[in-house]
Every structure is written in C-alpha cells, then in structure tokens.
C-alpha cells in the first residue's frame, strides 16, 4: 500500500516537472493562448520586423509579442482616436484601414496583407488617426509600442528595419497619390490587380490566381471609382483576355498585357496598396 502511494506520488511529481519544464520552454505559447508560431518559425518573417535580426535579437523581440486570438471578419482592431498602445503585424488574413469624414463617409486608405504592420500612422501623435478592420478571419501579432521603442534603441538592426518599414509606407502613400492623380480608371484597376499579384507572390502565393478579400465596393472606394465602374472594367479586362473573373476569384491570363495596361512600365508604380 505504501509502495503504491509512493509510485502515485512519483508519477504526479514527474508530470508536474514536465509541465513546469514545458511552461518555461514555451511560456510564450501558454501566455498567447497556445499559439505555436514564433518569429523564428514564421513563413513571412522576411517581410516583417524580424528580418535581419540575429537569433538572440529575435528571442528578445519574440518575448514581447502577444499572439492574439483570431480576429473575426468585420471586427475592428482599433478605432480613430484610440491611444497608440501597440503595432500589429498581420500573420494571416487581410486588414483594411480607413478614415471617416465629418459627413460620415468612409475612405479606405490601404489593404494590409500578411507581413504588413498596421499602426505606424499613430506614432506622431501617439493616437490612431484611422480605423483598422478585418476583411476576413485574420491573425495578428500585437507588439507593445513602448517596449518596441525601447528595444529599438538597444538594437540597431531592429531600428533600421522599423525605419525601412516606415519608409516603405511613405513611398506607398506617394505612389497612391500618383495613381489617383495621373491614371485613368482602367489603369487604376489594372495597377491595383497587378500589385496585389506582386504582393501575393512575395508571400509565397500564386501571382496569377488569387481571391479578392475585399468587395468591389471597397476596391472602388480605394481607387476613387464607383462599384459599377469596377464591375464594367473587370468585364472589359475579361473580354480582352487579360483576366478571368469568377466571383471573387481572379486569374491573370496575360501578365505582360496587365502590366502594360497598368502603366507600371511608364510610372514605375510599385505601391503596397
């Protein structure tokens, strides 16, 4: 009887030790709701903050990141006027950012894909000037800004990567202005589709076949065109043999023609959309 109790105690002790060991080894997984993917294992890390960091620096960054539960479609990540507490790195899904005018009109400012960071525009006033909303079920990594700012002061590579990402966002804004001011409706839509293709390709997805996660209304809002114009232009591109369109699914049949139509070769547009 005594031996049986000792054996039971030993088994319980071993189990507890294993649990404690696992908590120490993968403590971040426990804190983040069981998420097993970390910066070192993330397939899109080359597009995000971890790019160029060594293993020790990655561990320091990884320790401050919170992996949030899935954000459901239409759920808002933050609202205009919210204080800047964190930046958000998109792991999967699509997030749109937008502002709302005094008259209540929505203006979409970007569509963010996996590897993109959301929230940079809040740094100047430490307050979000825009909204961020999921267009589909999405996963994000939440990065506390104060801690990230402190870490970047100690890690030159991290600071350089943040500056590179911010510079890219400024470049995208400039190219968006050029897109809206210099291109006609057909060129705008062609540039939009081509750059989605390019961005999906950079993330390891097909450059020729993909699903539009945004509605035609969203695309029109972003490009300054009506829904009817978007539908008409998609039909025209399909008749020209450049695209095949089935609902939200796009197949690019003639990439060269799409690039030429987008005016990319003339204006060198490489917007991040």
Curated annotation (Swiss-Prot):
Localization of this protein: Cytoplasm
Primary location recorded for the protein, binned into one broad class: cytoplasm
UniProt keyword annotations, A-Z: 4Fe-4S, Activator, Cytoplasm, DNA-binding, Iron, Iron-sulfur, Metal-binding, Repressor, Transcription, Transcription regulation
Residues within the DNA-binding region(s): 216-235
Record GO cellular component, one term: cytosol
Source organism, top-level taxon: Bacteria
Residue intervals of the HTH crp-type domain: 183-256
Molecular function as annotated in GO: 4 iron, 4 sulfur cluster binding; DNA binding; DNA-binding transcription factor activity; metal ion binding
Cofactor: record remark: Binds 1 [4Fe-4S] cluster per subunit.
Pfam families tied to this protein: cNMP_binding, HTH_Crp_2
Binding site for [4Fe-4S] cluster: 39, 42, 48, 141
InterPro entries in the cross-refs: cNMP-bd_dom, cNMP-bd_dom_sf, Env_Response_Regulators, HTH_CRP, RmlC-like_jellyroll, Tscrpt_reg_HTH_Crp-type_CS, WH-like_DNA-bd_sf, WH_DNA-bd_sf
Cofactor: [4Fe-4S] cluster
Chain positions covered by the region annotation Dimerization: 159-178
Region annotation (Essential for the oxygen-regulated activity) ranges: 39-48
Subunit structure: Homodimer.
Cited function: It is involved in the activation of genes necessary for anaerobic respiration.
The protein's name: Anaerobic regulatory protein
UniProt organism field: Pasteurella multocida (strain Pm70)
Gene: fnr
